[in-house]
């Protein structure tokens, strides 16, 4: 067997293992969803943010992509944060007098959602009639079969790939085959720092793959935007993807600010005129040919309804076919115009399989948030590219895996992690951070980044109060702060610690002074790894009139909800307090890295030191803080 065959065999074996682990996760999630749907009461579904009930049904219409959509709005429980987002499948149901749920025999897709209103794509007119005629209507998330189907398809294609670029990339990423580089000079970027400049150059020189490793606050997005901008001097168009819609929005907005024409496939999570202006749907309906296309589509629908009434069917069919041909012509013309104007096509990894991108190939694919994406999801987009640039931080949040066996088997090990280990020459570590006071940053740097990070001079000593200690640990071990288990999804709660957290925040606000806080818009975040604690903290803040003037400056969320964000002041409630030193979820140190690196100027950690310091990470963190 020659060397090339050995590379291929090893790569295929690894991908087949991925396929097996992904199948385990798929079966587990599908079964869990089935059990939830059958056994879980509607109240619990609402609390988890996966269900709205009761619903008001608003207007229905055909959108610019000729999809029948309907607007629905939740009437109650508006304070509960939901998990609906663009592209997710949903199902509708009614509740009868004895509180049994009856599901409609169709699934729909979220087209757009904000806090309380959702636009849903329906499969047809009969589905619309069903929900318009229903009493006591609700909607809930449905199992996302499509994402899994696309991941399995992508893995299958990569495993079978032979004598093409996809096969080469597979063997480079998973084998010992060396990467190649272009031989041209080093380009200076005086507006970037040295490690950012080096990262952009590494991206430009890479023929196969490059990695931009961006620890917290190091300007990963700035670097990535610069790398994309430079790539566009050599390539007409690139594909930019991320795992989440929010990350796609963020990078798209920064590219638009830089003057790059972006076409965003899918709908943004935050809706404003700037964001909407570069979405595919908005651009499609703004095209000069769209009014004519809309008229033709309406004429086709009218002719179909005449056809059902038994008019001259042959004549109508000919008219419909002729109009359909004309509509297809116009759609192709509009699409060609939109794609020829765009320099960047931006979408989620799953959306890169959208039919409107079918057959398209790109010289370069950029994947942001790559350390949060399952490897199989990355391959969905990689199939379209000749070279791949991954950006992210594998020392922060990993992909979400629900099946413990799949996680133990390594499903949470991302493509980015594998390339960092196998191909260290492709990695650029960004080393200067622009977010935190140096004392907040230093522990994370030592533990996660081999002490290689440094603070920019402008943030090194930043603080709100003179002679303030930037990071403190409030030890709750002798304060009757006891944890309680409240169920699988919500984890644990520590009510006494939450009350203490509120008191610590009040004390710090009073130290700063309310007027100064409002004048300077000093903002606060409260983080807990547990949903139950987050919800309890939100309730306490909502009920307490002390916080009324500052509510717009406060955010309370889980660690996952804070990824990519920062605040002037952060309080972390660690919750766990028990004699056995059991810390469960807190064993995932990547999550804690996210939590402790959100604060710019003040970090207050609340936790039971006797429980937590049984773990070496928390012991070291506790000692570090006490030595300051």
Model regions and ranges:
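ASCE P-loop NTPase helicase motor core
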Residues: 96, 102, 124, 173-285, ...
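Pre-ATPase regulatory/linker segments immediately N-terminal to the P-loop/RecA-like helicase/translocase core
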Residues: 2-19, 77-201, 257, 274-302
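ATP-hydrolysis module of ASCE/P-loop NTPase motor domains
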Residues: 280-321, 382-384, 596
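Short, conserved secondary-structure segments in the cores of folded domains
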Residues: 80, 109, 335, 557-558
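Residue-level recognition of conserved beta-strand edge/terminus positions
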Residues: 92-94, 348, 573
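Small-residue-enriched segments and motifs
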Residues: 55, 105-108, 554
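Conserved helicase motor core of SF1/SF2 NTP-dependent helicases
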Residues: 234-236, 244, 336, 350-628
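A helicase ATPase "motif cassette" and its flanking acidic/Ser/Thr-rich regulatory loops
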Residues: 1-86, 118, 147
């Amino acid at each position: 067997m020659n060397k090339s065959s050995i590379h291929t065999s090893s790569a295929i074996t690894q991908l087949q293992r991925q396929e097996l682990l992904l199948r385990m996760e798929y079966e587990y999630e599908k079964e869990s969803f089935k059990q939830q749907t059958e056994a879980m009461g509607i109240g619990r579904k609402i609390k988890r943010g996966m269900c709205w009930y009761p619903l008001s049904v608003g207007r229905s219409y055909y959108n610019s992509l000729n999809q029948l959509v309907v607007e629905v709005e939740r009437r109650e429980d508006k304070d509960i944060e939901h998990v609906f987002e663009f592209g997710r499948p949903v199902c509708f149901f009614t509740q009868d007098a004895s509180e049994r749920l009856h599901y409609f025999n169709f699934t729909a897709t979220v087209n757009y959602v904000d806090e309380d209103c959702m636009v849903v794509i329906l499969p047809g007119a009969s589905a619309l009639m069903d929900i318009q005629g229903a009493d006591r209507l609700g909607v809930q998330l449905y199992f996302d079969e499509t994402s899994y189907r696309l991941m399995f398809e992508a893995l299958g294609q990569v495993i079978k790939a032979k004598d093409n670029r996809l096969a080469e990339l597979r063997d480079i990423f998973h084998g010992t085959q060396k990467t190649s580089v272009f031989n041209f000079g080093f380009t200076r970027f005086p507006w970037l720092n040295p490690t950012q400049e080096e990262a952009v150059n590494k991206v430009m020189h890479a023929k196969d793959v490059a990695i931009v490793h961006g620890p917290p606050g190091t300007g990963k997005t700035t670097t990535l935007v610069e790398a994309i901008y430079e790539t566009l001097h050599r390539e007409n168009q690139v594909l930019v993807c991320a795992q989440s819609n929010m990350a796609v929005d963020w990078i798209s907005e920064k590219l638009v600010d830089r003057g790059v024409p972006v076409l965003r496939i899918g709908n943004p999570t935050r809706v404003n005129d700037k964001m909407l202006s570069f979405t595919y749907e908005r651009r499609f309906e703004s095209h000069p040919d769209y009014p004519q296309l809309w008229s033709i589509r309406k004429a086709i629908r009218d002719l179909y309804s005449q056809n059902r009434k038994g008019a001259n069917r042959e004549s109508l069919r000919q008219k419909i076919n002729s109009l359909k041909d004309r509509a297809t012509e116009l759609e192709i013309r509009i699409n060609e115009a939109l794609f020829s104007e765009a320099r960047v096509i931006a979408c989620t990894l799953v959306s890169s399989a959208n039919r409107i991108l079918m057959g398209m190939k790109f010289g370069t694919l950029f994947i942001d948030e790559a350390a949060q994406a399952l490897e199989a999801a990355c391959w969905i987009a990689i199939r379209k590219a000749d070279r791949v640039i991954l950006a992210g931080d594998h020392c922060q949040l990993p992909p979400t895996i629900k099946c413990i066996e799949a996680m133990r088997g390594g499903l949470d090990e991302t493509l980015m992690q594998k390339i960092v280990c196998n191909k260290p020459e492709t990695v650029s570590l960004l080393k200067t951070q622009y977010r935190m006071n140096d004392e907040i940053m230093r522990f994370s740097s030592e533990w996660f980044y081999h002490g290689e990070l440094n603070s920019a001079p402008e943030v090194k000593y930043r603080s709100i109060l003179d002679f303030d200690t930037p990071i403190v640990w409030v030890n709750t071990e002798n304060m009757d702060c006891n944890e309680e288990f409240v169920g699988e999804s919500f984890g644990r709660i520590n009510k006494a610690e939450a009350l203490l957290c509120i008191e610590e925040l009040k004390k710090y606000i009073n130290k700063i002074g309310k007027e100064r806080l409002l004048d300077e818009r000093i903002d606060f975040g409260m983080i807990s790894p547990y949903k139950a604690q987050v919800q309890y903290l939100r309730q306490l803040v909502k009920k307490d009139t002390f916080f009324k003037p500052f509510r717009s400056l406060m955010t309370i969320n889980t660690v996952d909800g804070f990824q990519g964000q920062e605040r002037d002041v952060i309080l972390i409630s660690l919750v766990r307090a028990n004699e056995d030193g059991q810390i469960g979820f807190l064993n995932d140190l990547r999550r804690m890295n996210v939590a402790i690196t959100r604060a710019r100027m003040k970090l207050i950690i609340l936790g039971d030191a006797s429980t937590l310091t049984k773990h070496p990470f928390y012991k070291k963190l506790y000692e570090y803080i006490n030595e300051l």
